Amino acid sequence: MTDTPAPRHIPDRLDKPLTSAIFSWEALLVVVAVAIFAVNSFASPYFLDAWSLSDLTFNFTEKALIALAMALLIISGEIDLSVAAIIALASTMMGMAVQAGAGMPELVAIGLVVGLGCGAFNGLLVTRLGLPSIVVTIGTMSLFRGIAFIILGDQAYKGYPASFAFFGQGYVWWVVSFELTLFLVAAVVYWFLLHRTSFGRRVFAIGNNPVAAQFSGVRVGRIKFILFCLTGLMAGIASVLITSRLGSTRPSIAQGYELEVITMVVLGGVSILGGAGSIVGVVLAAFIMGLVTFGLGLLNVPGIVMSIFIGLLLIIVIALPILWRRVRRERLA
């Protein structure tokens, strides 16, 4: 008589991912997004209009594009506070070019090159000179925007070609804007880069312990330089979009964008201390920020109230993980 073997219970690898997915930060963000969407739909009769929802996407995509690259930079343990100033400088250079008769391809190229150049400048100061990124980018924030103010003064550049307007005002299909399409494509690219490549694994390793990563053969300085370049490039892309959408260039353009970008990143679950985060969370946080600010706009809430909200939200999302870790340590002690 043979013994019947007891059935094996092997759902650990299946159950844990399901459980962690249900109780993950991203799942909480989905619930918050749905709740805000519902509140907005009840608060304003215009919110659920298809074209109104399309306008919503213009409210956050330019900042969200920068947030994708900023997420990788913060995960690596660095930060860039100059992104809004990069937009201003790139937009100013495009304005000068259009006054000289440049066409649409040249304008796009100038925006991207200026953004990439500014990001590379930040990266060199941080990686080659060993300066703290927060200090460097506070300095370049003033530098880049100051140059824009010197060039423009109180005037504004206008007269952009009609073909240039597509990037910030055009639609790919029905109410689906070009800006939203570009953001979704970029989100997929950055998700793959961070979560499915060796480059992404190195970014996490650097954020967790840069010294250990260096000893294990990771070229820390090179990767951080690339991340600063990517952040500058995304700011350059955002400058093309916002300049195209507004149809003009002013030195005050995109003022305050850097705080909204960082809020999106941290709200998305990226640790401000580095070493943890996900692109999915950043995408969800971008939609939440867009829903909140657009909903407040429909209710004619003053802009200063939106600024107060963003400031409070940034403090809360930075403080919560730190307080939570402190509580856990006290419980384990």
Residue ranges and their predicted role:
Residues M1-V34, A38, F215-R222, F294-A333:
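Cytosolic-side transmembrane-helix boundaries in multi-pass membrane proteins
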Residues V34-G103, L124-L131, V265, G269-V280, ...:
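Single transmembrane alpha-helix segments in multi-pass membrane proteins
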Residues L14-S20, I79, Q99, L116-G159, ...:
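Short loop segments and helix-boundary regions at transmembrane helix junctions
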Residues L29-S41, M70, M141, R145, ...:
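Hydrophobic core segments of alpha-helical transmembrane domains in multi-pass membrane transport
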Residues A43-D55, F149-D154, Y171-W173, L193-H195, ...:
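Inter-helical junctions in multi-pass inner-membrane proteins, predominant
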Residues L129, S133-R196, I223-I226, R245-A254, ...:
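Transmembrane helix-bundle core of multi-pass membrane transporters
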Residues G103-G111, G117-N122, V126, W173-T249:
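Helix-loop-helix "hairpin" substructures at the membrane interface of multi-pass membrane proteins
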Residues A235, R245, T249-G311:
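Transmembrane alpha-helical segments in multi-pass inner-membrane proteins
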